[in-house]
Amino acid sequence: IDRFNLLSSSSLDISDYPINEHGLGMLSEEIGEHMEKSGGLPTDRNITIEARNDALIVNSCQGTKINETLGHLLLAMASTKSGNWGRLIIESTRIGIQASGISPEDLVGWLNETPPDALEGLLSVTLPNSRQLRWRFAEVGKAFGIIRHGVDPRRINLQALIRKYRGTVVLQEVLDKLFFEKMDIQGAK
């Protein structure tokens, strides 16, 4: 049943868990397949990367806010390399990145070579190109009286507003909201 001998650790008493032999076999298979694809199991100290059909999956057990931070950094770097803005899916245990022309080695390099203190500055430059900024700008713009209440955020000419308000307290407030509500820059360092 446990063909990879993953669940036979002396520190793990599997009988403490309500799982039958069939379930145990399924669990072992799933873990084994993951290890074959990514070379290990992700933990809070070990990040693994899987190459799927059209995406790279970064298995990171860091939680949603840290993964959001890391995901936006990786997407910005991938988009810079490929010349196209990719797609990002964030979950508490993984980051999915769809961008053409990137490899797992690229992701490892960007994670290892980006100075932690540069993270906030990089995100401040790259986030204004993100989809999330549109919604936050609509929210903050209404509070500052820039955008009328009831305006559909999808109809905002975001690039024009970003150009107009770059370097002002308005755009800084938008970024601060994103950093505080969606990301954990300190934790990602």
Q: Model-found features: residue ranges?
A:
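Extended, highly charged accessory segments
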Residues: 1-189
